[in-house]
Amino acid sequence: MARKKLSMQQQLLEKMKEQNCLVDAYLRNREGVLVSRDKDSVPYTAQIWFEGRECDTRSENDILKSIRTLAQIHKIMQLPVEMDYAGRNLQEEYIRHNQEMKKIRRFIRKKGAVNSFEKDYLKSVEWFLQKAAAMLETTDYKNLRQQSLQSGSICHGEYNQHNVLILGKNTAVTNFSHWSFDVQMADLYRFMRKILEKYSWDLHIAQKMLSAYDSVRPLSESEWQNLRVRFCYPEKYWKLANHYYTHNKAVISGKNVEKLRT
């Protein structure tokens, strides 16, 4: 990690510690710096660690505790913005994904659809492209992103069950190395999506997670809209198509065909 980003990460973690958040802040060496070197001049860092267990995704209590913790740290995670560390523009990313899906459609049409995956893709891609375009037209993402950057809002970037440690009544959060200045709904979406995939997209648990987050950090109308767009965008569909195109196009597993159909 670049020293400047590491320094900013430590600044963020120290700010969070001051607000009684349990986070894996770095430890400075005798010279007061974050990066040390061993006898072979290999750089390393040392961090606070916690004796706890990972969030158990089979436990509703753990899930909701993790969601409330995310909402709590989001209220604190702000620094003066550095555009070098801004997250990717979601609208630009969706436009690029749409272009890639169109490219894959052209490729299959040109060579001819032979297997089940290719035939199903040609049957369904137009609907997904139209859905994706409609999502982009209705979103207020541009203004929400601008507001988030102006306020210096920061995303964890890798908030999942592996980086949430349950310590009895308390919760620690680790591995902030993927942090960025961004719309914080990105964290909430990624965590919820991972959980919902394990729960067969159970709306009941989805509502509980949203309520838990909103009870700690109330969501604005733009943030609700942004979450809706993220969940409605055919991200999984794009990933399957992109995997097909970038890997061996002649070999498509039955599992991927089934995923495309569902």
Specify the residue positions occupied by each region the protein language model found.
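Active-site activation/catalytic loop segments of kinase-like enzymes and analogous catalytic loops
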Residues: M185-P218, F231-A250
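ATP-dependent phospho-/nucleotidyl transfer catalytic cores
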Residues: R3-K4, C55, D84-I154, K259
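Helix N-cap / loop-to-helix initiation motif
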Residues: L22, L219-E223
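A glycine-centered beta->alpha junction motif in the catalytic cores
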Residues: Y44-T57, L79, K103-K111, Y233-V251
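Active-site acidic catalytic loop and adjacent metal/ATP-binding pocket
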Residues: Y26, L136-A186
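Charge-rich, low-complexity terminal tails
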Residues: A250-T262
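ATP-binding pocket architecture of kinase catalytic cores
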Residues: M1-M83
